[in-house]
């Protein structure tokens, strides 16, 4: 990799792709996505305050997520299992796994392939 390619990669990592804010009566989700310009992987930092989604569950039809808890704590409630997490924990969410978040925390999420909203589905179960 050339020096210019390394510099380009570093510049891409510093560029915010988008900021998503979801507010409801019971939850707040703040997401910072980084423009990696790579369809195979992406990175974001989510701040979750409350339950997300507010009702039901969500699932990613295409993406697998590795989540690292930066601070605070909470639970991820999978269809068959409730997992408590704390700062420093790592959580794997497989594609097509059904879940919802509940807590007050900041989480780094790495998705492969890169996350896109059309493949994320909200479910009322």
Predicted region positions:
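Short strand-coil-strand connectors
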Residues: 37, 77-81, 104
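Short hydrophobic/aromatic-rich beta-strand segments that constitute the beta-sheet cores
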Residues: 76-78, 109-110
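Ligand-binding loop in jelly-roll beta-barrel domains
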Residues: 95-120
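Short, conserved beta-strand element in jelly-roll/cupin
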Residues: 59-76
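Short acidic-glycine-tyrosine-enriched beta hairpin
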Residues: 79-96
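A generic fold-level signal
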Residues: 24, 38-40, 61, 85, ...
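Conserved hydrophobic/aromatic positions in well-ordered beta-strands
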Residues: 44-46, 67, 108
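A short, N-terminal "cap"/entry segment at the start of jelly-roll beta-barrel domains
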Residues: 1-50, 54-57, 123-125
